[in-house]
């Protein structure tokens, strides 16, 4: 299935996006079909959050340049900022050396964390 709709541009439904086979063979999804995605602010290098992606979420992110993730608790897709307005414009997507983690370098508008903090790593320092 194509990642583009002739009327609206990139598909708005992540479930309909298909990952390029050349990319899919390089990503090592876990047994649940997920890969961790580390989200980093492209302007200052701060790590903002970690979320999970399946192949459709990754395909949707690549096609739309919007941070798209898989919620394990809700068993559904979520596009960052769709309800909060705290959007992520994806500038780069990289795969780590083992192929089992994705790095998204993004431009964040508003808070990245669902708590309202700029980053999910603002609190609870362990050392």
Swiss-Prot record:
The keyword 4Fe-4S does not apply. Keywords: Amino-acid biosynthesis, Cytoplasm, Histidine biosynthesis, Hydrolase, Magnesium, Metal-binding, Zinc. Mg(2+) binds at residues 96, 98, 100. InterPro entries: PRA-CH (IPR026660), PRib_AMP_CycHydrolase_dom (IPR002496), PRib_AMP_CycHydrolase_sf (IPR038019). One of its GO terms (molecular function) is zinc ion binding. It is found in: Cytoplasm. It catalyses: 1-(5-phospho-beta-D-ribosyl)-5'-AMP + H2O = 1-(5-phospho-beta-D-ribosyl)-5-[(5-phospho-beta-D-ribosylamino)methylideneamino]imidazole-4-carboxamide. The keyword 4Fe-4S does not apply. It comes from the Bacteria. This is Phosphoribosyl-AMP cyclohydrolase. It comes from Corynebacterium jeikeium (strain K411).
